[in-house]
């Protein structure tokens, strides 16, 4: 890929593919739709979908509004995330995250899915916010929503969700919660990142206020399952516990989190505390968090959770946290919660903890503590805790509030648990210091006030008396007022005389304390008691009379109703008022009571007669109270009270109320009697259901003896109450009908009519249902009918026509009506008595209503009534003609006798059918009354007479149900007379004050709607003629409905119904002029109505079917105000002429917008008419204020819809339709949408009138370039594309006919094409490419793709053309444009561009310009613009070549391009291009073009170039060869083996020449080697020596490295084929390594090359070669160790030990000669690796020489010291040698190794010992080597080598005394010996050392303490003897050994030499450090006998050291002062 292409690709938006795939439509994955459906939705349709969903969510969640502007607005449609900065993207991510979390609640709603679809398609949240998306969907993991989103997400590997969900994406499906739980467990996710993410979900949701039920359910269940798994598994991971605790605590402490959030935490929290033994700190954090206030949690739930986890914690003493007491005080109803928990679960342990915290501040918890401590089942432990703490706190506090709280609680506690409190008191007295805080005895004693309140409620009478007095005294002092009132109120109901007397002892005080309401409430139970005590009532009456009523006379009515009423009635068992008590009602304050002032004497008289006169007295009192009520000023209230008492549970009050009301019904007259009776009936009606009163005897309207006896003797019996009910109902027969006419058949009666009508109907109901005794029912019915008289039939009609009347009642009414009609003739006043039958036709509509009744029996009786009114032709007067409907009766239209008779006879003919089917009557009228062909005028007159008769009753009968029934009869009758009759009724509804309107307004909305709908139903197609009648009201009525100036309650409903009729066919039946008038009125109505009503009207207008001829005429009428000619006829002249054009525009908009133009028949005259609107608008554009743009757009849309369907061009021409108006509108309008629609029209007209369009094509496209190209919306570009696709082909066809060749065609099209290319920089970026692709396809890609691309490239040559874009951005467009077409077109463009390049380069030296792009250069352009044109075309050409690379191109075209480019390359030597990049770019282009050749051709061209080309061409061809060769398939290479061999041969020649082509040649060979096939190995082998040879000829390190790297590849590739060249490779590599001038990289590569030879062919490397390699590598180790070590490892692994070891022996000689320590270390490292990698089977045969070699090596110390080498160097070398020896030992078994070790021992100890002194230096050196080896063995093999200490032990026993005696003085040997012994003690583990051996060796070891004292000890390097003795002590626990060791060392501290004493103390210190615990028993002798002396040593250093030892001992034992005294 070229550098330009790389730059273009790097800056391309990731949205490019999506935006260009369908010209702006979104592509890719979709949440809602399958891929095939998703691809059909563009960005606008997805946005509309999202908008609808967002609007719905906004109504559900107003908080969604915050995302509207940024995510769901028009601006969001243009957001491209790929071009945003990082900061902008981060901000957008945060917004998207919040939005997704809020959408989480609505995922299951379709509205939520729409919003998510938008975020997926627009913001790619499924790729760029995948974590937030998954978090939002996780709560729905088991629903279908989850797999739907999972299937489209792209999860990055860095996401915590990757491991869990990435494997599920391919086959997404709902997943179980167990899968998620497993994924977040530490077994799957050790980092716990996913767990932390899920655990924080709720916290984040609370923070943002987006908590929802699904989230909480998921979170809780997941946490619970996770903990359950831990509970049943291996337990919870520490990290899991930490995360969960933090999460739970944070949520519990979150302010205002809410009840649901907190409830979600409790289950996993409890499970956590039960599963994991939490440490104190996290447990305390949980407990404290549970007490956090202000979280919005349910206090009961939270406290119960706290109690559960506290009760589960077996030992908890840290309380509840720092602020627990204060927080507990904020818990609502804490006491009740604790008591409930105690009752159900006990929770004794937890309760103790909570109560203890509350007791810290009892004043804050006084109420809650009292509730808990007063509980009857309080645990003893809580009682004891509370007693102790309260006593202690109350005694020690200075706060009076706290002390009072403690005292109150303790006092109550002591009453319930005296022994526990007393015990606590005694214990507190004993424990508290009496002087400071003596226990306050008063804490457990109640205050006098509390005693008084307790006494008030005591069972003992004397206590209650005392308590009452005390409470009154306290209240008088102002203490405890509320409590006092409560206590005294309770005692008012006391039945003991002494207590009552105590209450009234101070009446004034009692009045001051008790409010009147409280007093009445307190004393009321006494008066209403079942068995009241008369003398107690007397006491109360005295107080009320003498004091209460005197002070509060206003309370009289309340006292009468609440206290006195139930005591008036006397029964056999209840005598509340004796004579003496009754007399009290005559005196004092009772005199002032209204009712008692008049009935007082009667009460007294009633009680004087004693028991015998009690029954009579009750009646007397009742009548007296009735009379008092009659004269009362509060009559209505009194009646309400009496009726309420009918429900009283106290029989006395209930029966007394019945008696009083009975008396009132009989006594009252007029409205009061009627209203009272109605109230009683309303009360009784629902309460008598299920009761039967028929068996009650002696029941009548009078109160008889039986009734009063039942009241006196059996007041509680139900039968007594029923008798009272019957009696009062019987009294209703005395209610008198109001004077005057009552309109029975009306729904709008006056108040008196309504009351009596209701009363009469109720009485009729009672009289006809089988509940009352027969005599009572007959009496009531007779009384009612007597008063009704002739009105009875109308009354019966009102009953059977009422929908509320039960079926039996309707039947009774019809039967009574039948009887009335038969009996009416017998009345003396009846016309029938004079021989004239009565005409009952006025009730015929009511009979028709009954015939439609739902009950069959009703219909049957109705038929009988119908027969009874049939009569003959000569009927007399009409019954109730003037009274049936009251004032409206005159509107009733009567049938003629003939018509009446015929109508009834016709009905009776099918009467039985009416009985069977209630709907038959309607069908009958439909059959009879509809117009029928063949009927004469007489029949029509009869039919219309009946319709008029029925409609007149509809108009007169002002009751909704009858009207609806009658109208339903005519609903299917089609006759104009119905509409004529209905119009006056409808028109009256325009006036809200009319009677009809007022009546209808009083009805429920449902009935209003049915009525209006029934009337408007008469507006049908069949009755349209009524609307056209001269002088008729119909048409005016319709137009008035459209008059917005008229306001009425019903006009809107009428208008809607009229619309329905119009749409239903009425409009189509109108005359054309009526249609026009109606539509104009409708349009004007739309503009005047409110928005909602206007929308309804618009919908109607849209549905009206208007024919084209009417449309044309309508357009003329509506356009009149826009015409400029003053002579044009106007339909209407308005006052405000200047506003008429604007108004006309609005009306035209409404009209044009209402038509569905695609469904209207296409008509050229109609198009011309619409064009006339545009012409008129052009003239009025300046004076029209608004709407003109929209109208133009809609008109263009209409024209477009019509023109698209017109196929006859001649029709358009005949209608004189032209394009000039369209062009004028385009030029005049500034609205882009108008111009767009105009362009669409122009594009359609191009098909019909092409010549006219071509004449105006340049203005069209100039406008497009200046305006539409700069807008970014799908519609605009749809318009542009359509315009281009229709007009451009017309233009190009004309140009092609004029051009002779492609260059001429380009030149002639230059101006036309420049319109588009000049605007490329101003187009919206993501729409630029789709447009040009469409443009080129419309032009023809084969002809115009090349010139369009050339012009687009030419834009980059000037700043103006680039339009502030960078060059790379400008060149991106043509490159992407070419990419949209197939290979053949691209190849063709490639050839055209090469030709243009040739023309441009030729024009550089010509005066007459030939090139196409030269025509774009002007005189003002810069002189270098032609060079820039060439440069940018070359860059563009590179882009094309990049797109064609690897594609199958036309070889002929490519070869032609290559030939032309070669010619051009030769011509770039012109001076004008010498300083530019053109030559090099041209060569690159040539090379890229060559890549388009096939592999065969490519290899052939390469071979030719290597033979004939220039050096630069060879370099280029080799580079291309190296780059492209790996792309050739193996089967093709197999075919080209000879060519490749020839190429390699030529490359070998180039390498031999070592010219400038070497580097390129090496790369070419390297490319062949890396991808070679087997058949090419021979050719590669032939070139290998040349490659090796060239290394010595070149000087450049980079080339040397490349050559060596190639040699390495060749060696590894060719393997055995490289054997002949091993020596040359090794020589070259070793020479390079030895070179001191070579760069490190070359040396490194030389080592790599050597390694490749050793690894590939190790068996073919000779010993001599190996020796050279070893020596060179060992020498190089001085310079750098890494390469040497790597090569050592390779040699050791690849060369067999048998072959390598002799070479090592030989090399050892050379290394020794050099004598360098570095070389020796390197040698021994090589030896170690050799032995490490040696095969075990090879060692036995080599063991003797190897061991001999090591013995020789071990003598190296001696030889090196003879040379004066530094000891440290000697030690390092020896360490290296020993390391090698240890590798050998690792390979040996014990039988093999042991003899070798013994031989090593002999070598070190015996071989040189004969005849020499023991202090011989060389012998000492060998011993040092032996001990070094032993130390290494012990370190490496631990106790496995301990037994070998037995071999050394005899010699050790010799050496230790020798050192002690001074015969041996080698400090290194001494140090090493002690270290070996110490190591042996350390690792032994019982393998060698025993107590006996240790004891044996102990004296010799201790004897070493005084030796080599100059060695100063330090923590890092202690004295060897001290370490050795410490290891000895640490290796044993035997007391004998430790005692001997301790004693021996302690004895050494008594040396005279202070240095020795110090050394001994150092050893002693190390010994106690190592085994202090086992030596505790040695403390006495060690401290008292030795350390005590040393602490007083004369040497300060000794004293300090002794104190140090003592301190170490005291760490184990504690203070040892007693041993030192």
Curated annotation (Swiss-Prot):
It holds the Pfam family U3snoRNP10. GO terms for cellular component: 90S preribosome; small-subunit processome; t-UTP complex. One of its GO terms (molecular function) is snoRNA binding. InterPro entries: ARM-like (IPR011989), ARM-type_fold (IPR016024), BP28_C_dom (IPR012954), HEAT_Utp10/HEAT1 (IPR056473), U3snoRNP10_N (IPR022125), UTP10 (IPR040191). Its main location: nucleus. Disulfide bonds: none annotated. It comes from the Eukaryota. It is found in: Nucleus, Nucleolus. Component of the ribosomal small subunit (SSU) processome. PANTHER family: BAP28, HEAT REPEAT-CONTAINING PROTEIN 1. Belongs to the HEATR1/UTP10 family. Involved in nucleolar processing of pre-18S ribosomal RNA. Involved in ribosome biosynthesis. This is U3 small nucleolar RNA-associated protein 10. The gene is UTP10.
């Amino acid at each position: 890929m070229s550098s330009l292409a790389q730059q273009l690709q790097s800056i391309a938006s990731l949205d490019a593919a999506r935006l260009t795939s369908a010209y702006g439509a979104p592509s890719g994955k979709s949440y809602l739709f399958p891929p095939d459906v998703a691809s059909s939705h563009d960005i606008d349709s997805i946005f509309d979908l999202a908008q609808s969903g967002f609007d719905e969510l906004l109504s559900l969640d107003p908080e969604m509004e915050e995302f509207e502007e940024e995510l769901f607005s028009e601006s969001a449609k243009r957001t491209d995330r790929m071009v945003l900065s990082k900061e902008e993207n981060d901000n957008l991510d945060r917004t998207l995250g919040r939005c997704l979390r809020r959408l989480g609640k609505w995922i299951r709603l379709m509205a939520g899915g729409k919003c998510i679809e938008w975020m997926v398609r627009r913001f790619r949240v499924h790729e760029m916010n995948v974590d937030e998306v998954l978090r939002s969907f996780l709560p729905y993991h088991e629903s279908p929503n989850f797999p739907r989103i999972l299937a489209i997400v792209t999860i990055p590997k860095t996401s915590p969700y990757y491991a869990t969900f990435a494997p599920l994406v391919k086959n997404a499906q709902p997943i179980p919660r167990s899968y998620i739980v497993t994924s977040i467990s530490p077994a799957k996710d050790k980092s716990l990142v996913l767990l932390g993410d899920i655990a924080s979900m709720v916290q984040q949701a609370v923070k943002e206020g987006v908590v929802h039920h699904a989230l909480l359910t998921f979170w809780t269940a997941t946490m619970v399952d996770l903990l359950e798994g831990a509970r049943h598994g291996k337990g919870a991971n520490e990290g899991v516990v930490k995360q969960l605790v933090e999460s739970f605590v944070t949520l519990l402490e979150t302010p205002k989190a809410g009840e649901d959030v907190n409830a979600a935490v409790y289950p996993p929290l409890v499970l956590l505390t039960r599963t994991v033994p939490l440490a104190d700190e996290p447990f305390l954090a949980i407990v404290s968090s549970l007490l956090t206030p202000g979280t919005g949690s349910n206090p009961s739930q939270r406290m119960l959770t706290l109690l559960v986890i506290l009760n589960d914690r077996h030992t908890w003493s840290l309380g509840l946290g720092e602020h627990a007491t204060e927080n507990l005080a904020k818990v609502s109803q804490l006491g009740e919660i604790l008591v409930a928990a105690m009752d159900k679960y006990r929770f004794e342990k937890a309760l103790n903890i909570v109560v203890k915290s509350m007791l810290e501040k009892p004043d804050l918890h006084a109420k809650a503590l009292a509730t808990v401590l007063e509980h009857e089942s309080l645990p003893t432990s809580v009682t004891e805790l509370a007693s102790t703490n309260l006593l202690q706190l109350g005694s020690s506090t200075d706060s009076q509030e706290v002390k009072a709280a403690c005292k109150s609680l303790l006092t109550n506690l002591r009453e319930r648990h005296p022994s526990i409190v007393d015990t606590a008191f005694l214990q507190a007295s004993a424990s508290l210091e009496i002087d400071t805080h003596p226990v306050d005895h008063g804490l457990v004693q109640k205050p006098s006030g509390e005693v008084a309140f307790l006494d008030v409620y005591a069972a003992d009478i004397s206590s209650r008396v005392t308590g009452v007095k005390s409470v009154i005294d306290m209240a008088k002092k102002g203490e405890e007022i509320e409590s006092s009132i409560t206590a005294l109120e309770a005692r008012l109901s006391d039945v003991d005389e002494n207590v009552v007397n105590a209450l009234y002892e101070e009446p004034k005080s009692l009045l001051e304390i008790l409010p009147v309401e409280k007093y009445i409430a307190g004393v009321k139970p006494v008066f209403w008691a079942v068995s009241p005590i008369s003398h107690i009532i007397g006491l109360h009456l005295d107080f009320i009379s003498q004091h209460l009523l005197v002070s509060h006379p206003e309370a009289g009515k309340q006292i009468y109703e609440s206290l006195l009423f139930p005591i008036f009635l006397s029964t056999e068992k209840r005598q509340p008022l004796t004579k003496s008590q009754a007399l009290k009602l005559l005196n004092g304050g009772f005199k002032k009571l209204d009712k008692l002032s008049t009935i007082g004497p009667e009460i007294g008289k009633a009680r004087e007669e004693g028991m015998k006169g009690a029954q009579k007295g009750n009646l007397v009192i009742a009548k007296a109270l009735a009379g008092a009520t009659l004269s009362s000023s509060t009559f209505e209230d009194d009646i309400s009270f009496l009726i309420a008492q009918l429900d009283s549970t106290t029989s006395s009050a209930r029966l007394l109320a019945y008696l009083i009301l009975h008396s009132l019904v009989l006594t009252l007259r007029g409205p009061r009697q009627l209203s009272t009776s109605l109230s009683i009936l309303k009360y009784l009606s629902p309460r008598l259901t299920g009761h039967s009163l028929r068996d009650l005897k002696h029941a009548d309207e009078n109160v008889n003896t039986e009734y009063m006896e039942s009241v006196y003797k059996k007041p509680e019996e139900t039968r007594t109450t029923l008798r009272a009910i019957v009696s009062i109902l019987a009294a209703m027969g005395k209610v008198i009908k109001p004077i005057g006419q009552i309109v029975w058949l009306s729904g709008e009666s006056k108040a008196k009519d309504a009351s009596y009508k209701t009363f009469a109907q109720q009485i009729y109901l009672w009289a006809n249902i089988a509940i009352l005794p027969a005599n009572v029912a007959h009496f009531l019915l007779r009384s009612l009918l007597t008063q009704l008289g002739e009105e009875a039939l109308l009354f019966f009609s009102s009953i059977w026509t009422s929908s509320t009347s039960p079926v039996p009642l309707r039947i009774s009414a019809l039967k009574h009506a039948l009887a009335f009609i038969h009996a009416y003739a017998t009345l003396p006043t009846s016309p029938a008595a004079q021989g004239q039958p009565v005409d009952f036709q006025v009730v015929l509509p009511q009979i028709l209503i009954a015939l439609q009744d739902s009950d069959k029996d009703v219909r049957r009786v109705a038929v009988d009534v119908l027969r009874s009114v049939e009569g003959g032709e000569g009927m007399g007067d009409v019954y109730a003609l003037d009274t049936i409907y009251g004032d409206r009766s005159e509107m009733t239209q009567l049938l003629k006798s003939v018509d009446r008779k015929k109508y009834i006879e016709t009905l009776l003919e099918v009467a039985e059918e009416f009985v069977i089917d209630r709907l038959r009557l309607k069908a009958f009228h439909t059959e009879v009354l509809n117009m029928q062909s063949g009927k004469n005028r007489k029949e029509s007159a009869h039919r219309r007479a009946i319709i008029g008769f029925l409609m007149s009753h509809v108009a007169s009968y002002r009751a909704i149900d009858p009207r609806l029934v009658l109208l339903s009869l005519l609903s299917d009758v089609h006759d104009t007379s119905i509409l004529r009759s209905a119009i006056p009724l409808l028109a009256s509804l325009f006036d809200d004050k009319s009677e009809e309107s007022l009546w209808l307004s009083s009805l429920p909305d449902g009935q209003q709607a049915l009525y209006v709908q029934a009337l408007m139903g008469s507006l049908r197609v069949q009755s349209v003629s009524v609307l056209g009648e001269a002088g008729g009201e119909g048409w005016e009525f319709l137009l008035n409905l459209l008059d917005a100036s008229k306001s009425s309650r019903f006009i809107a409903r009428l208008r809607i119904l009229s619309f329905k009729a119009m749409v239903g066919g009425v409009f189509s039946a109108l005359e054309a002029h009526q249609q026009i008038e109606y539509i104009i009125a409708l349009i004007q109505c739309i503009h005047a109505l409110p928005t909602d009503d206007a929308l309804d009207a618009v919908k109607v207008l849209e549905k009206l079917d208007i024919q084209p001829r009417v449309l044309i005429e309508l357009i003329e009428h509506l356009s009149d105000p826009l015409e400029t000619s003053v002579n044009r006829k106007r339909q209407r002249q308005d006052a405000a002429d200047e506003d008429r054009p604007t108004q006309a525009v609005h009306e035209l908009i409404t009209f044009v917008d209402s038509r569905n133009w695609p469904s209207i028949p296409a008509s050229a005259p109609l198009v011309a008419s619409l064009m006339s609107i545009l012409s008129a608008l052009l003239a009025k554009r300046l004076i029209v204020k608004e709407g003109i743009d929209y109208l133009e757009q809609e008109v263009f849309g209409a024209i477009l819809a019509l023109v698209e369907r017109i196929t006859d061009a001649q029709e358009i021409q005949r209608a004189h339709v032209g394009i000039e108006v369209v062009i004028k509108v385009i030029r005049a309008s500034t609205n882009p949408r108008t111009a767009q629609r105009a362009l669409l029209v122009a594009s359609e007209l191009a098909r019909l009138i092409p010549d006219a369009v071509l004449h105006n094509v340049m203005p069209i496209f100039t406008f497009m370039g200046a305006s539409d190209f700069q807008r970014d919306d799908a519609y605009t570009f749809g318009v542009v594309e359509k315009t281009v696709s229709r007009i451009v082909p017309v233009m190009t066809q004309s140009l092609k006919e004029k051009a002779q060749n492609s260059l001429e065609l380009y030149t002639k099209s230059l101006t036309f094409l420049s319109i588009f290319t000049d605007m490329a920089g101003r187009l919206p970026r993501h729409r630029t490419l789709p447009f040009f692709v469409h443009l080129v396809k419309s032009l023809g890609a084969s002809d115009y793709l090349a010139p369009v691309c050339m012009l687009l490239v030419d834009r980059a040559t000037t700043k103006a053309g680039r339009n502030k874009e960078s060059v790379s951005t400008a060149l991106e467009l043509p490159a992407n444009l070419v990419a949209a077409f197939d290979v053949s077109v691209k190849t063709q463009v490639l050839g055209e561009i090469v030709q243009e390049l040739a023309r441009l380069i030729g024009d550089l030296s010509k005066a007459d310009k030939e090139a196409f792009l030269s025509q774009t250069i002007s005189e003002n352009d810069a002189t270098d613009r032609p060079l820039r044109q060439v440069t940018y075309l070359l860059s563009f050409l590179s882009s094309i070549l990049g797109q064609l690379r690897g594609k199958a191109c036309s070889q002929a075209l490519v070869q032609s391009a290559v030939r032309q480019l070669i010619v051009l390359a030769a011509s770039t030597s012109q001076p004008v291009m010498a300083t530019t990049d053109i030559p090099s770019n041209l060569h690159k282009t040539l090379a890229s073009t060559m890549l388009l050749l096939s592999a065969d051709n490519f290899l052939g061209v390469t071979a030719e170039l290597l033979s004939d080309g220039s050096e630069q061409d060879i370099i280029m061809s080799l580079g291309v060869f190296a780059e492209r060769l790996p792309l050739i398939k193996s089967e093709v290479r197999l075919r080209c083996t000879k060519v490749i061999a020839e190429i390699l041969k030529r490359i070998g020649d180039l390498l031999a020449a070592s010219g400038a082509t070497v580097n390129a040649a090496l790369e070419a060979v390297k490319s062949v080697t890396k991808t070679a096939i087997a058949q090419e190995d021979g050719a590669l082998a032939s070139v290998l020596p040349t490659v090796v040879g060239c290394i010595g000829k070149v000087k450049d390190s980079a080339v040397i490295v490349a050559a060596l790297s190639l040699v390495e590849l060749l060696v590894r590739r060719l393997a055995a084929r490289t054997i002949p060249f091993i020596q040359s490779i090794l020589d070259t590599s070793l020479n390079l390594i030895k070179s001191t001038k070579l760069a490190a990289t070359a040396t490194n590569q030389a080592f790599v090359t050597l390694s490749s030879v050793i690894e590939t062919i190790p068996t073919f490397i000779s010993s001599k070669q190996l020796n050279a390699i070893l020596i060179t590598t060992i020498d190089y180790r001085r310079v750098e160790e890494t390469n040497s070590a790597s090569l050592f490892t390779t040699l050791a692994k690849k060369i067999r030990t048998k072959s390598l070891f002799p070479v090592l022996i030989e090399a050892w000689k050379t290394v020794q000669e050099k004598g360098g320590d570095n070389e020796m270390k390197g040698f021994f490292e090589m030896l170690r690796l050799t032995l490490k990698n040696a095969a075990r089977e090879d060692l036995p045969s080599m063991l003797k020489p190897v061991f001999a070699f090591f013995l020789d090596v071990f003598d190296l110390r001696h030889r090196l010291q003879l040379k004066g080498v530094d000891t440290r160097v000697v030690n390092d070398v020896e360490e290296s040698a020993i390391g090698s020896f240890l590798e050998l030992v690792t390979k040996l078994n014990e039988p093999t190794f042991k003899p070798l070790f013994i031989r090593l021992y002999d070598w070190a100890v015996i071989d040189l010992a004969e005849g020499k002194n023991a202090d011989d230096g060389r012998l000492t050196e060998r011993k040092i080597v032996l001990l070094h080896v032993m130390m290494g063995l012990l370190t490496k093999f631990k106790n496995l080598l301990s037994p070998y200490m037995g071999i050394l032990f005899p010699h050790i026993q010799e050496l230790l005394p020798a050192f002690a005696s001074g015969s041996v003085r080698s400090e290194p040997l001494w140090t090493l010996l002690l270290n070996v012994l110490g190591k042996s003690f350390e690792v032994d583990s019982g393998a060698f050392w025993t107590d006996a051996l240790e004891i044996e060796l102990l004296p010799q070891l201790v004897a070493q303490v005084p030796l080599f004292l100059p060695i100063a000890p330090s923590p890092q390097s202690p004295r060897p003897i001290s370490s050795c003795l410490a290891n000895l002590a640490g290796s044993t626990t035997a007391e004998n050994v430790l005692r001997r060791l301790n004693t021996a060392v302690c004895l050494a501290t008594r040396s005279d030499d202070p240095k020795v004493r110090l050394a001994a103390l150092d050893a002693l210190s190390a010994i106690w450090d190592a085994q202090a615990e086992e030596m505790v028993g040695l403390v006495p002798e060690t401290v008292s006998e030795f350390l005590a002396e040393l602490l007083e040593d004369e040497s300060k250093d000794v004293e300090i050291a002794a104190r140090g030892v003592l301190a170490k001992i005291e760490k184990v034992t504690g203070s040892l002062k007693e041993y030192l005294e």
